[in-house]
Amino acid sequence: MFDVLMYLFETYVQSELDFMVDQDALTDELTRAGFQKPEIYKALSWLEQLAALHDSEDAPEYTACASDSFRIYASEEMLKLSTECRGFLLFLEQIRVLNCDTREIVIERLMELDSPEIELDDLKWVVMMVLFNLPGGENACHQMEELMFEPEAITIQ
């Protein structure tokens, strides 16, 4: 499923090409690209759930966390997210790429992936997808891109 998400993000979203709304045509194109239909359906469902967060009235605004807050991970989350991944999420909060709300969206989207354990690179791409989808997240998305592709260019404020 993650391969389908990456293909869609790189092909349509990140390249700013028009994203097909017709799910059948998109499914056919993804099948021609070599993806299996069950994986395509899972990925499209994952994206629909992410988009629903953007469209809902409960979409988080991009605000800072209270400096004294601390995230306690559930046992299922600890099994799926390594110490490295959890540390990276904390780092993203500390440099204000993520806030409390966006961190929770990222964790929720990571938990919905069908991988038993999340790799750090996969986490980074999910963060990009979430930030790209949220209104007001442009600066954070740009900072995340710099962190991914030009790690020496990131400035901690």
From Swiss-Prot:
Organism superkingdom: Bacteria
Signal peptide: none
InterPro entries: Smg
Family: Belongs to the Smg family.
NCBIfam families hit by this protein: PRK03430.1
The name this protein goes by in its record: Protein Smg homolog
Native species: Tolumonas auensis (strain DSM 9187 / NBRC 110442 / TA 4)
Taxonomic lineage from the root: Bacteria, Pseudomonadati, Pseudomonadota, Gammaproteobacteria, Aeromonadales
